[in-house]
Amino acid sequence: MELERIVSAALLAFVQTHLPEADLSGLDDVIFSYVLGVLGDLGPSGPSEENFDMEAFTEMMEAYVPGFAHIPRGTIGDMIQKLSGQLSGARNKENVQPQSSEVQGQVSISPEPLQRPEKLKEETMSSAGDTQDEAAGPEEELLPGVDVLLEVFPTCSVEQAQWVLAKARGDLEEAVQMLVEGKQGPPAWDGPNQDLPRRLRGPQKDELKSFILQKYMMVDSAEDQKIHRPMAPKEAPKKLIRYIDNQIVSTKGERFKDVRNPEAEEMKATYINLKPARKYRFH
């Protein structure tokens, strides 16, 4: 996390210095991880033609920051070399403490282990000097307005203030609004709303939920408590027909009457009676 913060602060300051009108919204964790991986492969020796492809790096940065390709290659190389030295110093600082504890736990068998604390002391002094240079670097390249943000938000770090101010393109009011709303910038930012005064804090979760429901949602509580029981459809009364063609249908008042059409004699002759003939026996 510390290495990513160093990379993000250095890139933001570099782009803001050479491209003041550039859109920094494309700089995210993906490009920071890419730069960190590229610089990790370089090592403390810095960039060279064998281990660093300037064209590929410039093309990648151009995709995230339009106009990055117009920056001179020498300026980009100096920034890469300086940032590589800062990262190597930070890595040495992280590795010194585990190595020193491991050396103290070992038993001195030969004269070689006895000389290791002196080497560690020299590495510690060199890493401390690199760390001081690293700390002095961002302070020299602070964006205008960072001191105001740090004064208003004491819990905000320098990297966070630079990130928010770069996102706001130097607009101090917009940067303050972003800090109040708690918009996260660098990966390790836990949010600035922890120790802010009540008037500068953003709305809490429950308050925000109730506000949204009150403003945008219409809830009819009386209507929700009602139980809707639809009425059963009423049956239509039977329509009784008593007369058809001026004749009484029946005394019961049925609706329909079986009306048979008269058939011709030729049609009747075609009918076949399938029932067997009835046998009559006379005694």
Curated annotation (Swiss-Prot):
Keywords: Cytoplasm, Nucleus, Phosphoprotein, Ubl conjugation pathway. Residues 141-184 form the CUE domain. The modification Phosphoserine is found at S110. Residues 87-139 are annotated as: Disordered. It is found in: Cytoplasm; Nucleus. Residues 115-124 have a biased composition (Basic and acidic residues). It comes from the Eukaryota. GO terms for biological process: negative regulation of cytokine production involved in inflammatory response; negative regulation of macrophage cytokine production. One of its GO terms (molecular function) is ubiquitin binding. Pfam families: CUE (PF02845). InterPro entries: CUE, CUE_CUED2. GO terms for cellular component: cytosol; nuclear membrane; nucleoplasm. Its main location: cytoplasm. Residues 87-109 have a biased composition (Polar residues). Interacts with PGR and ESR1. The CUE domain mediates interaction with PGR and ESR1. Belongs to the CUEDC2 family. Controls PGR and ESR1 protein levels through their targeting for ubiquitination and subsequent proteasomal degradation. This is CUE domain-containing protein 2. It comes from Bos taurus.
